[in-house]
C-alpha cells in the first residue's frame, strides 16, 4: 500500500458518500494549508484510499482519506467539524497526522515519476520512494513543527504499510529506511526505538550503518532530484554488497519477524507518548490564546481610555 501514487489503481475510487462531502471540503482545506497550495481536492469516505489509510495522487492533485481508519468506523460525519480549527484537530489527531503526511507529499514530492522511472531501475525506484517518506517529514517538520505529534499519532498507519516481510539484509535495509531515517528526520526519537535501531545496527555493522545514515542525511537535505536519484542507487548498491558479504540467511540470530514485531511494539508506545504530548500541547495553546486575548483586550481598553480623554 502506497501513500504517493503516480498512477491510477485498478478500479476507480467509489464516489464519496454524500454525508462525507462536507468533511472532504475541510480535509482539502487543511491539506492545502499544510502543503502551501490551493489546488488540492479531497476524496473522503469509508472506501477511499484503495486499502491505505490515506494517499496522494500528484497528477490529480487529490488526497484520499479512509474515514474508518482516520476517524474510526463509529464516527459520524457531523461529529468531525472544521479540521482547520486547531481545537478540532485535537479531537482527531490520527486523522490530522495522516493528512499532514499526505500534505507534505503534496508540498515536497514535486518530482516527475516518469523521469525518475527513466533514471532508476525498479529496485532503485523503490529505494527512492522509501527515502522520500522520511524526507518529506524532515522538510515538513522544519516548516510546520506544530504537527509533529499529530504525525506521531498516526505513525503505525504511516510506517506499517511497508511492513518488512522479507529476509535478513532486505529487512534490515527496509527498517533502516522506515525507522532509523525517521529518527534522523526528527519524527521519532532514538530512545523510543532503541531496540529496533540496535538490532539493525548489530546486523549491518557500525560502518555500514554510518554509511546509510550519511545517505539518509544527504537525501533529506537535498533539493536536487538528480542527486537523490544517485543516492537511491548508492542505497541499493550498498544493500547488494551487504547481501553478498553476509548471505541472505547468515548466522547470528537476526530474525526479520522479530524485528517487525519490535517495530510494531515501539510504534504503539510512540502513539501513547504522542497522545500525552498532544494534551500538553493543547493546554499550552489554550493558555497562549488566553494570554493573547487578555493582551488584546487590555490594548483595546487603553485605546478606549485615550479616546475618552480626547473627548473630555
PLM feature spans:
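Negatively charged
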Residues: 179-312
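Basic/hydrophobic alpha-helical interface regions
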Residues: 1-168, 172-190, 201-205
Amino acid at each position: 500500500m502506497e501513500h504517493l501514487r503516480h498512477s491510477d489503481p485498478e478500479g476507480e475510487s467509489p464516489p464519496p458518500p454524500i454525508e462525507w462531502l462536507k468533511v472532504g471540503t475541510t480535509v482539502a482545506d487543511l491539506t492545502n494549508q499544510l502543503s502551501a497550495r490551493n489546488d488540492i481536492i479531497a476524496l473522503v469516505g469509508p472506501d477511499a484510499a484503495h486499502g491505505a489509510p490515506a494517499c496522494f495522487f500528484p497528477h490529480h492533485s487529490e488526497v484520499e482519506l479512509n474515514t474508518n481508519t482516520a476517524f474510526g468506523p463509529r464516527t459520524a460525519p457531523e461529529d468531525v467539524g472544521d479540521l482547520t480549527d486547531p481545537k478540532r484537530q485535537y479531537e482527531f489527531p490520527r486523522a490530522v497526522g495522516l493528512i499532514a503526511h499526505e500534505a507534505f507529499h503534496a508540498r515536497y514530492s514535486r518530482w516527475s515519476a516518469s523521469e525518475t522511472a527513466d533514471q532508476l531501475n525498479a529496485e532503485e525506484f523503490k529505494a527512492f520512494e522509501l527515502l522520500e517518506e522520511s524526507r518529506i517529514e524532515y522538510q515538513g517538520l522544519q516548516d510546520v513543527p506544530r504537527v509533529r505529534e499529530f504525525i506521531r499519532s498516526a505513525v503505525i498507519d504511516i510506517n506499517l504499510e511497508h511492513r518488512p516481510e522479507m529476509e535478513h539484509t532486505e529487512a534490515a535495509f527496509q527498517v533502516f529506511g522506515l525507522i532509523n531515517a525517521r529518527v534522523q528526520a526528527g519524527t521519532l526519537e532514538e530512545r523510543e526505538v532503541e531496540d529496533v535501531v540496535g538490532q539493525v545496527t548489530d546486523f549491518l555493522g557500525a560502518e555500514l550503518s554510518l554509511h546509510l545514515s550519511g545517505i539518509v542525511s544527504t537525501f533529506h537535505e537535498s533539493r536536487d532530484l538528480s542527486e537523490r536519484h544517485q543516492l537511491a542507487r548508492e542505497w541499493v548498491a550498498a544493500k547488494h554488497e551487504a547481501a553478498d558479504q553476509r548471505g541472505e540467511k547468515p548466522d547470528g540470530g537476526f530474525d526479520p519477524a522479530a524485528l517487525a514485531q519490535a517495530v510494531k511494539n515501539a510504534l504503539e508506545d510512540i502513539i501513547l507518548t504522542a497522545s500525552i504530548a498532544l494534551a500538553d500541547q493543547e493546554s499550552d495553546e489554550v493558555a497562549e490564546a488566553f494570554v493573547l486575548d487578555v493582551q488584546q483586550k487590555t490594548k483595546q481598553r487603553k485605546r478606549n481610555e485615550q479616546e475618552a480623554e480626547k473627548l473630555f
